[in-house]
C-alpha cells in the first residue's frame, strides 16, 4: 500500500495511555439499564432511520445493514422486550426516501419539488435531494404493526400547508385489485404496484 509498516509496540504504547481514561467509562450497560428499570427510572431509547430500511423487515435489498425497528432497542441494550412499555413512532406528513428503492407515492413533478424545497429535504452530509411523495398509509400501517407502536407523532404538517390538494395512499393496485396490506418480503409487488 506504499505505506510504512505498522510497528505493533508503538501502537500498544500509544493506546495503553488511553486505558486509564477509558476504564472508568466502561460498564455492563445492560445491567445499568436493568437496575434503572428496577428502580423505576425512566429510560429512553432513540432509533434512527425508518422501518422500511430495516435489514429484516424493510424493502430488501434497499435497506441499511442493521435493524431499525423498535425490537432493536431491546436487542441492542440487552434488556428484555417486555420492558419496552411505550413505543413511539415518528413519521412525516409526507414520505421521503434517500437513494434508490421502491417508492409507490413518489412525486417526480412540481409537488415533489415543492415538498423537497419547503421541507428542506436535502442530505445533511451530501446536500443531495431526497425523493418525496404522499403519505403512504399502507406502509405506515405495516410500520405500526412491525414496531408495536403505542403512539404515533406526525411531523412536518406545516410543509403541506401551501398545497391546494392533499393526497394519501390508502391502497395499492395490482392488476386492478386493491391491496390494503402488503408484506415487504415480496419486493416484486412494489415494482408492479401503483396507488
Task: Identify the meaning behind each predicted range.
Residues 80-131, 162-184:
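A structural-propensity feature for long, helix-poor, extended segments
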Residues 29-53, 112-126:
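Short, hydrophobic/aliphatic alpha-helical segments
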Residues 42-77, 95-98, 124-148, 154, ...:
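Conserved phosphate/anionic-ligand binding catalytic regions in large, soluble enzymes, centered on
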Residues 14, 75-77, 176:
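Long, low-complexity N-terminal extensions
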Residues 5-9, 48, 88, 100-107, ...:
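Short coil/turn segments at secondary-structure boundaries
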Residues 185-192:
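Conserved small/polar residues in nucleotide/adenosyl-binding loops
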Residues 1-32, 43:
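Internal alpha/beta core interface subdomains
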Amino acid at each position: 500500500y506504499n505505506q510504512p509498516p505498522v510497528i505493533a509496540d508503538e501502537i500498544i504504547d500509544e493506546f495503553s495511555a488511553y486505558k486509564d481514561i477509558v476504564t472508568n467509562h466502561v460498564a455492563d450497560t445492560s445491567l445499568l439499564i436493568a437496575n434503572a428499570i428496577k428502580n423505576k427510572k425512566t429510560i429512553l431509547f432513540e432509533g434512527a432511520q425508518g422501518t422500511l430500511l430495516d435489514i429484516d423487515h424493510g424493502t430488501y435489498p434497499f435497506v441499511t445493514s442493521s435493524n431499525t425497528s423498535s425490537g432493536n432497542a431491546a436487542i441492542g441494550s440487552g434488556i428484555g422486550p417486555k420492558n419496552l412499555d411505550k413505543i413511539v413512532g415518528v413519521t412525516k406528513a409526507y414520505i421521503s426516501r434517500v437513494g434508490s428503492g421502491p417508492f409507490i407515492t413518489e412525486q417526480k413533478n412540481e409537488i415533489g419539488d415543492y415538498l423537497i424545497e419547503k421541507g428542506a429535504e436535502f442530505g445533511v452530509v451530501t446536500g443531495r435531494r431526497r425523493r418525496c411523495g404522499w403519505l403512504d398509509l399502507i406502509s405506515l400501517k405495516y410500520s405500526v404493526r412491525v414496531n408495536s407502536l403505542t403512539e404515533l407523532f406526525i411531523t412536518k404538517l406545516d410543509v403541506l400547508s401551501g398545497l391546494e390538494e392533499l393526497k394519501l395512499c390508502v391502497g395499492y393496485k395490482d392488476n386492478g385489485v386493491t391491496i390494503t396490506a402488503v408484506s415487504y418480503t415480496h419486493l416484486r409487488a412494489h415494482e408492479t404496484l401503483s396507488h
